[in-house]
């Protein structure tokens, strides 16, 4: 992973934010609700970011995450058209583990979420906004319930019958839907 990937994942884990610019704001003591600088927020912001970085860099966590990704069929990095999808999946993995979710739930939800992101294209365009919205919902109602709601609303019969087949008709060699099919 690049340093940008590391900062993005740590930001999602520590602050539930997808934009890199939010890291600077958090570490500067900016209160996201009031938009005022509060110096007393700085130590906690640094502690949260450090904790996220330590979890992210733990070899055990990274290898466990790679095992989950490979069990979903993604055995080669060339099967990914979006590093942002992988970043979100790793952040989700770390968040669920920190929340005490069982290994079987983490494995299932992370696999399904990764495939859903790649099939629907949620990791392209203004993905930071979608990721932040998803992270907020995960904090409020849990990852499994949030995923089930997203699957129900986005992976409809119309998606499978019309949207996905039309996305598969592409001459691009980095078509995310086709690469997901290969996985």
Segments (PLM) and residue ranges:
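Intrinsically disordered, low-complexity N-proximal targeting/linker segments that flank membranes
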Residues: 118-183
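Short secondary-structure subsegments characteristic of cysteine-rich extracellular domains
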Residues: 103-118
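Residues that form generic nucleotide/phosphate-binding pockets
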Residues: 68, 92, 113, 134-141
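Short, solvent-exposed secondary-structure capping/transition elements
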Residues: 98-106, 122-124
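Short, low-complexity intrinsically disordered segments
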Residues: 86-88, 111-113, 158
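Polyanionic (Asp/Glu-rich) segments that form extended negatively charged tracts
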Residues: 1-98
């Amino acid at each position: 992973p690049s340093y940008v990937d590391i900062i993005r994942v740590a930001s999602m884990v520590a602050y539930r934010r997808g934009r890199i610019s939010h890291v600077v704001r958090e570490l500067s003591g900016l209160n996201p609700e009031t938009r005022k600088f509060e110096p007393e927020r700085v130590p906690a912001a640094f502690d949260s970011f450090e904790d996220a970085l330590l979890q992210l860099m733990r070899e055990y966590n990274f290898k466990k995450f790679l095992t989950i990704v490979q069990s979903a069929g993604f055995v080669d990095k060339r099967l990914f058209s979006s590093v942002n999808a992988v970043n979100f999946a790793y952040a989700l993995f770390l968040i669920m583990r920190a929340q005490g979710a069982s290994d079987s739930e983490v494995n299932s939800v992370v696999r399904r979420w990764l495939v859903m992101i790649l099939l629907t294209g949620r990791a392209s365009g203004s993905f930071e906004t979608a990721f932040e919205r998803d992270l907020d919902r995960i904090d409020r109602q849990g990852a499994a319930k949030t995923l089930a709601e997203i699957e129900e609303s986005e992976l409809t019969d119309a998606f499978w019958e019309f949207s996905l087949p039309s996305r598969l008709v592409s001459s691009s060699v980095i078509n995310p839907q086709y690469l997901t099919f290969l996985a």
